[in-house]
Regions:
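Basic, low-complexity intrinsically disordered segments
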Residues: 1-155
Length: 155
């Protein structure tokens, strides 16, 4: 360490901590906004699809048309594949309040993994465990793949 910095070390350390805390708050806010945006996109797609059986053909074309327009302006996050994920996200988590309480330390990769869990009770259990135990998305994915929920259920 440069001896000229020694008297400034406490203020340097404090400011570094402030920056790190601010970056963490910004990341969490952006993550929450992104997840809720994806959920709301899924909700809007579902609402549009459910607006009548006579519109079945219209509904089949909806996602490809949306994707073509949205990817032009906003990039590949709005591909047909991702729009299907957002739609499924809304179906799997129909109550946005569940998301509001859990998105602090879960990112989109966590939720994408959760979409693979067909059983609602298991999905909520995995979501809570991932949030409470700070599982990475990779750990969550592995635990889903090994049906960790079933082994915990027997304990």
């Amino acid at each position: 360490m440069d001896s000229n910095l020694i008297p400034y070390q406490p203020v340097i350390s404090d400011i570094k901590n402030l920056i790190a805390a601010g970056q963490n708050v910004a990341y969490n806010a952006a993550n929450r906004a992104m997840i809720m945006t994806y959920w709301n996109i899924g909700k809007r797609i579902v609402e549009e699809e459910q607006s009548g059986a006579e519109r079945a053909e219209y509904g089949k074309r909806l996602i490809p048309v949306l994707s073509a327009e949205l990817t032009k302006e906003f990039g590949n996050s709005y591909s047909s594949r991702n729009l299907h994920y957002y739609r499924k996200f809304c179906h799997c988590f129909p109550d946005s309040e569940i998301l509001n309480t859990r998105v602090q330390n879960l990112n989109w990769s966590h939720f994408r993994a959760l979409l693979r869990v067909p059983d609602e009770d298991a999905r909520i259990w995995y979501m809570n465990e991932a949030a409470n135990e700070n599982w990475s998305a990779r750990t969550l994915d592995r635990n889903i793949g090994t049906q960790y929920y079933r082994s915990e259920e027997r304990r």
